[in-house]
Regions:
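Eukaryotic intrinsically disordered, low-complexity regulatory linkers and tails enriched in Ser/Thr/Pro
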Residues: 1-102, 106-170
């Protein structure tokens, strides 16, 4: 059974988690609640992308233009959901996903004491195994992508408003 995924603007983070059923996904929400879904993080991300008729691979390739990396690129699903990957666990077996995704479209804060973590809009802390410098770099890239998406959306709205005004004089 496919669980219903929350709205993009409600998702603060998407984390891989080992459960008795195997790899699962914990979704942290902006209000502090959590949802556990019975699928891998990759499947959850694919489902989030597909409801916007988007491809994970194409979004990651597009983000590589900003990051100049081949892997661990942000997934910009929508202006409300720009997911930045961060390493949160060691794999139990080779091939296990080790990356969580944090939504930089919502307020996130890097916490370095006692260990590196990202604090979400809902106040949850996501422990990160990377260095402070690497985390800051990934968050900055995601914020840059988010700002560009917002700017493109604003330009689109202004163009539509201008066309509407032009038609009113006909």
């Amino acid at each position: 059974m496919r669980e219903e995924l929350p709205e993009d603007s409600e998702i603060a983070a998407v984390l891989p988690e080992y459960t008795e059923r195997g790899d699962s996904t914990r979704i942290l929400l902006r209000d502090g609640r959590e949802i556990l879904i019975d699928c891998t993080t990759k499947t959850a991300l694919r489902r989030l992308a597909e409801r916007h008729c988007k491809s994970l691979g194409l979004m990651r390739a597009w983000a590589a233009n900003y990051t100049h990396r081949r892997s661990a690129n942000p997934v910009a699903i929508d202006c409300d959901l720009v997911l930045v990957p961060v390493k949160t666990r060691e794999p139990r077996v080779p091939g296990d996903n080790t990356l969580a995704q944090v939504n930089v479209a919502l307020a996130v804060r890097l916490v370095t004491e006692p260990h590196c973590a990202i604090e979400t809009a809902g106040g949850q802390r996501v422990p990160v195994l990377w260095s402070r410098k690497m985390i800051q770099s990934h968050i900055a890239e995601g914020c840059h992508i988010h700002a560009d998406l917002l700017q493109a959306q604003q330009r689109s709205v202004l163009r539509r408003l201008a066309r509407k005004d032009d038609r009113s004089f006909l």
